[in-house]
Amino acid sequence: MPFPKPYPPTPIDYEDWNLLVDALEARFGSSAASFIRDRTRIINSRGNIWEKAAGNIQLAIEDILSDGGGAVWLPKGKITETSGWVVDEEKPVYVHGAGMCWHGLDRGTMIEFALSSGVHCVDFDAASTIHFGGLYDFTIFPTAGDRDAVHLDSVSDWHMERIYINQARRHAFHVQSTGDAWNLYVKDNLIENCVQKGIRLEGGVGAGVILKSYFLNNYFYANGGDVELGALDGTTGKVRLCQFHNNQHFNTVGVGMKMYRKVEQILVMGGIFYKTGGDAIDIDDDGAANKCERITIGPVNIDGQGSTPNGVDLQGYTDHVVIGPGQIFGFTGSAVNQGVNVTNVTKVGLYES
């Protein structure tokens, strides 16, 4: 006979801490008090516990790497790190916080990184591809250093969700793929005040291709540039078959979204661009062999507020671009500025003013 469940559920009434613990122990056993205390410390999936202090998150990561991978749970509060987090083995590592909060505060999980030059805040970079892993529900606030907030190389099936990155000293999220990187899910993040790019997908470092990845519902504000993708520092790799859905770009200092060299089969859907200092969307190359092609942009809304040079700037040998439906207005140059060697551009339901 199944255990009868009271309805409505019997409430837990308490007046102070001891009564709360007594009530929890009555329901869950003698470990309830320890469980509550453990929520204020760093815990990993091996069941090991560290105090909330600088350096201990890396110890928790190394501990699960020794066990083939796993998860680390961070407590509410602020931790100031003077060294970065490193995952340098081909094993899955998941780091979960207690929620985003404003930088510098402790209303959620707030990780301040005060680093020396040349060190990333969070670095997933192993000898070969890291399969699976992710970052969830906390704030990254770099206050010193000159590298990326989150840096990946050759990673697949990886998530970054509900992360707030403010004032990245270089890029907020940077894939610098010497090998292939795929199935990256970057969604529901807040990325603000980055010195350079909010998201940089660099497929040309080696032969690596960044592909089959998804960037959804991210909010960008006042970054040097919001999104940059392509064979940016070389021409061997590329970026292809990626989707950008429902991202919002506000008050970007430079270009909102830039594609440069060997970018193929990209879908930009539901984007809002507001008052970008450079072009809202810029697509270019350095020759016909490295052209960008098969790009779809729409629906899209670009409000230049009288300061954005061009809504969509198509240069080089860019080929097969579909723009619309949507609206592009408030620019100082053109809604769609098409270079002389750009071919096969189609506008569908696009209002330009």
Question: What are these model-derived regions, one by one?
Answer:
Residues 36-37, 44, 61-68, 88-89, ...:
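Flexible, charged surface loops at secondary-structure boundaries
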Residues 1-37:
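Extracellular "spike/adhesin" assembly and maturation modules
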Residues 69, 82-84, 104-107, 114-120, ...:
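Short glycine/acidic-rich loop motifs that flank beta-strands on beta-rich extracellular proteins
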Residues 122, 203-205, 231-234, 285-287:
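Short, recurring structural edge motifs at helix starts
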Residues 53-58, 62, 69-117, 139-140:
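N-terminal extracellular ligand-recognition/capping segment immediately after the signal peptide
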